[in-house]
């Protein structure tokens, strides 16, 4: 059962325990809207001691009826138009805030391609019911999530009982271990005239990386 939120427990929240900001100033309008909308869905969430936060559960159905717009999304190794493009920037920024406050990460996976707003290995992809970002509050006091996007920058700040950090600070580092040059793959298309080529997906550079947490 989810621990009950009480006034006494909320009074233990006395300051910031982590904060992380990413930029989306150059995003298309639909994506900008989705980032701000998704941020508003998790803003004000309280994660009680021992409780596991689920990003997908807080966001709810990612549909046009729910208010999300069309924007570019990663589908395998391609970028396609789809409902909810931009949601992964919010989950990735939240992942960084969770790492910096030493939350216990219960579920997280990186994108199939590098993202523009974070170094390789620092992101957290979410998709449907299959891919989620989940973390557990390891502290004896609740954690409050503040999330806000202003169409340029997305900030996620976590508040809690500052003494729970034990005077420690946490830094996250990404080290690129290899760079994979993009390849051009040509495939026959019966719908095109002979000798005509169409660029379906621009080649992108791949990376392998290691991520470290320093206390």
Annotate each PLM feature.
Residues 1-215:
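Well-ordered beta-sheet/strand-loop patches within structured domains
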């Amino acid at each position: 059962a989810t621990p009950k939120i009480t006034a006494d427990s909320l009074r233990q929240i006395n300051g910031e325990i982590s904060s992380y900001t990413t930029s989306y100033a150059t995003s298309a309008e639909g994506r900008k809207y989705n980032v701000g909308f998704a941020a508003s869905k998790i803003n004000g969430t309280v994660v009680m001691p021992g409780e596991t936060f689920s990003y997908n559960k807080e966001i709810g159905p990612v549909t046009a009826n729910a208010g999300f717009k069309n924007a570019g999304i990663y589908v395998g190794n391609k970028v396609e138009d789809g409902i909810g493009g931009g949601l992964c920037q919010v989950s990735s920024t939240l992942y960084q805030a969770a790492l910096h406050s030493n939350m216990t990460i219960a579920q997280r996976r990186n994108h199939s391609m590098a993202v523009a707003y974070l170094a390789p290995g620092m992101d957290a992809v979410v998709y449907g019911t299959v891919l989620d970002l989940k973390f557990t509050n390891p502290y004896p006091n609740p954690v409050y999530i503040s999330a806000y996007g202003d169409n340029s920058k997305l900030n996620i700040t976590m508040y809690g009982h500052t003494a729970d950090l034990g005077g420690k600070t946490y830094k996250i580092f990404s080290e690129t271990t290899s760079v994979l040059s993009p390849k051009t793959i040509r495939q026959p298309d019966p719908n095109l005239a002979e000798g005509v080529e169409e660029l379906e997906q621009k080649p992108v550079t791949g990376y392998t990386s290691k991520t470290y947490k320093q206390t």
